[in-house]
């Protein structure tokens, strides 16, 4: 709930999946079209994410890039990977230990909406940060 409060009004949705927390960042607020550099206007939001990740430091962080199905599979796969790495790199620059993070591009393989409409394609273009507790073995 601290995370929700921190990210209120940023355009990022926060959902819980079991013990994991998923931050969904729509690409229209995070990146320019077909680009992998984080928009400077999105830095304050990522700074807020970093503050929370530093506080909850017994977690593993998966940064997952996703695209819609427009264009070639290879291009989308590559773009989603670069976007995930871009977000992970920014968080690393904010003091998040890179060893806690993985960045993976999934291209169009995990849609959350239909690619038949622009609204659906827009939902599919996203970066998700999944935060999972480190379990003691």
What are these regions (language model features)?
Residues 4-11, 30-65, 89-93, 122, ...:
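Periplasmic peptidoglycan-binding/anchoring modules of Gram-negative envelope and division proteins
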